[in-house]
Amino acid sequence: KGKNFKWKLLQNSPNTINAILSEKKLIKKWVSEYDLSGIISDNRLGVYSKKVPSVFITHQIRVMSGKTTWISSKIHQKLIKKYTECWVPDVEGFPNLSGKLGHVKKFNGNLKYIGVLSRLEKEIVPELYDLMVIISGPEPQRTLLEEKLIIELNDFSKPVLFVRGVIESEQIITRSDNIVFYNFMTSEELQKAFNYSNKILCRSGYTTVMDLAKLEKKAFFIPTPGQFEQEYLAKMYHEVNIVPTASQDDFVISDLKQIDSFRGLPKFKNEINWKQLFALFKGK
């Protein structure tokens, strides 16, 4: 599975290079056309300019790719150094959320750790669901996990909210015994759903991890097979007794009992000095 993922990355590399070149061409035009004061790139490697301060946002200073991690990381770091600053959505010290992904010993780039970022807010509301299942990621793995979990949940009697992660023209809500199914949710609905739920069963993508930390929710992770970043994060949290995990093939519903014996994600007080951060663009 890991080999298949790397092969797909290799196949997509011409598309990635073309995308970077297209972004650079567009940015060059925009800088002069709109008199830009600066650029903030959310993980887009072609979105920068030498003429104005340019910031790259990423939690991956080290890019996990199995045996080729060292070279994928070096390439990524070289591209990051083209930017004036790199903002990492994590804390610099320990404990942190990104582990080796966002923390490297030797890097000459201008890194700034800006704290854990999430658009969601913790709410004090009644608990409506014992378990929230939220599925995401590429096909066919999304469908394979959905089908597996529906079977496993036959042995789960408590209230469940199941978000399938399928974006369609209309929202569809169905009910089956103790489970409420949504094909997708808006950001506002997701915030309420997370807050209404006792525990979360989901992938271990970094955005989801930050959301769970912000909401102080306990979880169980099933990383997307072959996605090295998710597999690394899930393994790291499991080994330090923060969040339990299982592979997609091995997971059984009784594994959820482990959640209570794990500490849960650390709490962070985010005190981002936005004025200080954006001073980079002042007078440009």
Report each predicted region and the residues it spans.
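Short acidic active-site motifs
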Residues: 26, 75, 188-192, 208, ...
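Conserved nucleotide-sugar phosphate-binding/catalytic loop shared by glycosyltransferases and other
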Residues: 1-15, 180
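Catalytic binding pocket for nucleotide-activated donors in carbohydrate/polymer assembly enzymes
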Residues: 208-209, 213-263
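A nucleotide-sugar donor-handling region in carbohydrate enzymes
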Residues: 58, 63-140, 164-168
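Donor-nucleotide binding loops and adjacent catalytic segments primarily
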Residues: 101, 115-199, 209, 231, ...
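Hydrophobic acceptor-binding patch used for acceptor engagement in glycosyltransferases
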Residues: 199-200, 218
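Conserved nucleotide-sugar donor-interacting segment of glycosyltransferase catalytic cores
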Residues: 23-87
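Leloir-type glycosyltransferase catalytic cores
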Residues: 11-16, 242-284
